[in-house]
């Protein structure tokens, strides 16, 4: 792998770790008590527990992958990185979507199922969730770039396919 690409790959993987840790910390410590409606915390909402779980998986994988890039025997396992990066990126997409939907409903409610918006009563909680979602979305962007890098590394090992025109010209000679 080119040194610049390896440095970018490592930097992104290392950057994902504190972003994921911050997402987890902001989500887990986020709670607000309301005298009318009671205490709201992340563990009351399944989608936020999912986001915390995916963030923990993401940070753990990023750490292992960042270390593995510098170990010679694992550098040649480009397909392992490619598949793993794709899986993590897709898991991140699902958790960002779930958290975004929760935040949307918290701000706007859903009149059809008689859910009222909650952010007027739990403004601090909603602001904390918004910050956590922004960090989680940034982590997703990093993993999309990592997925592209690992795809490039995996598929650049092969020659491009020969076009039918080149095949016909080769047969004529």
Swiss-Prot record:
Report the membrane topology from the UniProt record: Multi-pass membrane protein
Q: Which residues form each disulfide bond in the chain?
A: none
Q: Fetch the InterPro entries from UniProt.
A: CASP/CASPL, CASP_dom
Q: Does the keyword Transmembrane apply?
A: yes
Extracellular compartment residues: 30-50, 108-131
Q: Which UniProt keywords apply?
A: Cell membrane, Glycoprotein, Membrane, Transmembrane, Transmembrane helix
Q: Where in the cell is it found?
A: Cell membrane
Top-level lineage group: Eukaryota
Q: Which residues cross the membrane?
A: 10-29, 51-71, 87-107, 132-152
* Gene Ontology cellular component list: plasma membrane
Which residues get glycosylated? 34
Ranges in the topological domain labelled Cytoplasmic: 1-9, 72-86, 153-173
User: What PANTHER family is this protein classified in?
Assistant: CASP-LIKE PROTEIN 2C1-RELATED (PTHR33573:SF30), CASP-LIKE PROTEIN 4A4 (PTHR33573)
Q: How does it assemble?
A: Homodimer and heterodimers.
Q: Which family would the database say this protein is a member of?
A: Belongs to the Casparian strip membrane proteins (CASP) family.
Name used for this protein in its record? CASP-like protein 2D1
Q: Which organism is it from?
A: Ricinus communis
